[in-house]
Regions:
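Active-site neighborhood of HAD-like aspartate-dependent phosphohydrolases
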Residues: 2-58
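Metal-dependent phosphoesterase signature
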Residues: 65-101
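C-terminal cap/substrate-recognition subdomain and adjoining C-terminal extension
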Residues: 2-12, 87-172
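Short, compositionally biased "basic patch" segments
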Residues: 49-77, 126-134
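Charged/polar, solvent-exposed surface patches and flexible loops
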Residues: 29-36, 44, 48-51, 68-73, ...
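A general boundary/transition motif marking the beginning of the first structured unit of a protein
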Residues: 18, 37, 58, 72-76, ...
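Generic structural signal for well-ordered secondary structure
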Residues: 23-27, 63, 67, 152
Length: 172
């Protein structure tokens, strides 16, 4: 990823990715991509994935608890992926069409995209649409360890840890 230095007083626009710039939930779409690509392995994860999703949506567990209690699914699967960069390219070849048209009309060179989507996946689409500044979740693909979850309140913390008190013109 590429982070920039803001000129004194210059405000930036910050965009959430899923359901703002991207038509849908990229996490769900990447899950479906791997379900088609590797149905036997992904099918094994569906019961626990579903349980985690339901418990989270009902408010029974928080984001960090989801990672703590269910993160091993991601860890175990990530280490089995042979060529993540090839998969990401293939995924965006199929799903790039889900980038909403409005964004190209208002895009500015210093926009920042913030997403729960892992940076390894987010980076490819940002490169394709000309966005240099993005923050996402961080997953070490060699060992499957989740290093940063960029979700809900963590998005603000991630932004501040990278950009400090950079002024924000609009947050979409």
């Amino acid at each position: 990823m590429m982070y920039f230095s803001c000129k004194e007083g210059k405000a930036v626009n910050v965009y959430d990715f899923d359901n703002t710039i991207y038509d849908g939930e990229s996490g769900f779409d990447i899950f479906m991509f791997y379900l088609k690509k590797d149905p036997k392995e992904i099918a094994k994860l569906i019961p626990r994935f579903g349980e985690a999703f339901i418990r989270y949506k009902r408010g029974a567990i928080k984001t960090d608890e989801v990672i703590e209690q269910y993160g091993d699914m991601l860890t175990d699967y990530c280490v089995k992926i042979k060529d993540i960069h090839k998969d990401i390219t293939e995924f965006w070849d199929e799903d790039e069409k889900k980038i909403k048209n409005f964004y190209a009309k208002i895009q500015a060179p210093d926009d920042v995209i913030v997403s729960a989507c892992p940076e390894i996946i987010l980076g490819e689409i940002c490169k394709r649409i000309g966005v240099k500044n993005y923050i996402g979740s961080v997953v070490d693909m060699e060992n499957g360890i989740i290093e940063r979850v960029c979700y809900k309140e963590n998005k603000i913390a991630a932004f501040k840890s990278i950009y400090g008190d950079m002024p924000i013109d609009s947050f979409y």
